[in-house]
Amino acid sequence: MSALGQSNSLLHFPALQPPRRFLFGPGPTMVHPRVYEALSKPIVGHLDPYFIQVMGDVQQLLKMAFGTGSGTGSGTNDSATLVISGTGSAGMEAAVTNFVEPEAKLAVFANGYFSDRLTEMAKRNGANVVRFEKLWGETFTEDEAREFIRREKPKVVAYIHAETSTGALQSGQAICAAAHDAGALAIADCVTSLGGVPVDFDQTGIDVAYSCTQKGLSCSPGLSPMAISPRAMDWLRARTSPVRSWYFDLKLIYDYSTVSHRYHHTAPISMFYALREALLVIAEEGIENRWERHRRCHKLFVKGIEAMGLRMHVPEEHRIATLNTVCVPKGVDEAKVRRRLLDEAGIEIAGGFGPLAGKVFRIGVMGPLATEDNVQFFLKEFSKALHAEGYSI
């Protein structure tokens, strides 16, 4: 085929027409129409004064979401907020690469897939990793956290605040306090919690937190918000060995976004527009009102699930309000249930993986879908799909 003929054949790709889905999975979630509109705004340069202002707006609004400063985005606290150009895994990599030096001891609270991923990143960075392991879905008590850190004397401690693979919410106050008593930094993975449940960065004593945009913030995927405490910033400035990643060097990124605005990389302009709008939507609702809405819908969801005779995987006191893990009933093929929901109702949910593969459904109720009507809609369709696959309700 000639080059001209090949070129003409490429013109036959159809126009994009994504199917309408109800994103009840662990993420990405539904996006507010204003966020879609923001994505369509004209591009400016990544060094343009207007974009510099947009970055500043995003950093200020993130203070509200993380719970640092006054909690209203006024910027009264010295904690830094910034945004990594990449998904939540980029934020994880940035946290590990910048704050866990080669051969330094990192203590990881391991109870799910994403603590395993963090462990792998740290090992590739040359860290000496020690792990406190529990079954997927379990959490760590205050006494367990203190004893582990006291015994290991690490330089850095890491835990998953909201474990996406299990739906378990880990309290961080005892972990962070014990880390500080040991002279260590505390890193928290807030990928599934930010925007949907309180992170309380300052109150908890977190030093470094990272998240993503496509879950609790109800934005499209592509950015990783971070918050960094003053003591972590001091530690970073005093670091003697070079950060092994140039792209994820937070000193360079912070200088570009906050200080001199010298070129570091070409930021994804449209995604910053989208994140700014998503954060404004949250601010207009009120962050505490948003948390309460998610709590209310979570309770309604659990009530409906239990009325079907189904069981939640995580104990009540440790559940994430935005992400539910429901045990698959005996004799039911969870993959067939998920496929039926997608084909017949346009509903997307996720299955488990790792030790939970085939054993749980992972169902997100977050952002625009966290309303009583939407929860009732989901429960009705979920019940129908289960019944069609042989489950008697």
Positions of PLM-derived features:
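Conserved N-terminal alpha-helix of the aminotransferase class I/II PLP-enzyme fold
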Residues: 38-94, 113, 117-123
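Active-site phosphate-binding strand-loop segment of PLP-dependent enzymes
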Residues: 139-195, 208, 216
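PLP-dependent enzyme catalytic core of the Aspartate aminotransferase-like
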Residues: 2, 16, 355, 359-393
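Active-site C-terminal subdomain of aminotransferase-like
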Residues: 30-31, 214-303, 307
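Conserved active-site segment immediately N-terminal to the catalytic lysine
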Residues: 202-214
